Amino acid sequence: MPIGPRETVTSLFFEKLQPLGVEALVEAVEQVASGRARPRAQDEARASFQGLVDDAVAAVDLRKSAVEIDRLVRGCDPQPGAFLRLEGKPVRLFDAELLPALDLTPGSVVRCDAAGLVVALRGGALRVGRVRADQAKEPAQAFAERAGLGAGGRLESGA
């Protein structure tokens, strides 16, 4: 299955893969029930395990490239939310879009408007549509206004 450039866990897993998994499970149950199933062992050499995505994984490192950070943010959306820090507190990032490069220090806020919060990165920028700094996700613009974060402001690495 092709993975698009804006996929998140929600769009890829819940909207695309989960329905296919349900179909495959129904087919497998029908094969077992009818005696047509042909079991085979999993090749352990090709098996892999992905543990839970926690804050150790979700912390954004501003030394990484814009492409790597964009992928991390999308991979942590909707949970737990990749994060940067503002005044030492995590700001989790959602609904992100990779933008062209800007000549600014990574973590610098370029602008914040109804379209989202734009943060400079190495080799690009990230437009963030929603954030979670306290309990609930909210539009990035509402958070930025409340936090006094605007153009010229700075977010720090999450790690």
Question: Can you say where each PLM-predicted feature lies in the sequence?
Answer:
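Active-site-proximal loop/hinge segments within enzyme catalytic domains
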Residues: 1-99
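An anion-binding loop in the catalytic cleft
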Residues: 62-159
